[in-house]
Amino acid sequence: ISEANAHPQSSEEAAVVAELRAGATPVGTTPFTTAVLNGDVDNHADLAAAEALELPVEVTTDAKVIPVLWSRRLAEGLAGEVAFRNAVAPMEGSVAIAGHSAAHPDELMLALRGSGQALYIGLADDAFVIASEPYGVVEETSRYVRMDGETPSDPANANATRGQIVRLDAAAAGQVEGINRWSYDGTELPLSETDVVTAEVTTRDIDRGDHPHFLLKELGDAPSSFAKTLRGKLLE
């Protein structure tokens, strides 16, 4: 656990980081992207080696490969969701990813694959609310779309089509029309109002303690949760 490994991770590779620290203006950089990850990119080391990624030595999180690969795909001329999908599709493991590109400031990209994580897209007034469970959505809206990381769009080609890619457009924030969805192989998965779920939980069901938001409660609980995880596994 370190500041260098904190999320979001950026697409800046080692040479760019060194120039920035020296006060210089980087030359010939790739498009700037950022990403956050919940889950594990099991083959991140293999991807870094295969693509000859120049990662800062102090950054050891598997999440770093996401924005770097995405930036490289954009630099190769791939556009929009195609670049994002090509970056995340080779990643093995169960992942929930959110990414942002400076070239498209009004868009947010999401990816979900596997059963270990979840992503909910809340439809609020003029806003999308992204959370890993309904508790993170219902404070702002009771309506949401749940991404599906397991069901293949083509059962005959399950491995390539399992998982979903989503692009959120700020121009239609909070509306179904602002959500574009594809399977991992690029097959479009149209949305309609029938995909929208009304939450069965409300803010009354959320135990926030004295915290104003559930996220702050989770952050506050982190030390005790960490201690409980280690309990019985370490010797004095």
Question: Where in this protein do the model-derived segments appear?
Answer:
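Conserved short alpha-helical segments that host acidic/polar catalytic motifs at enzyme active sites
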Residues: 1-236
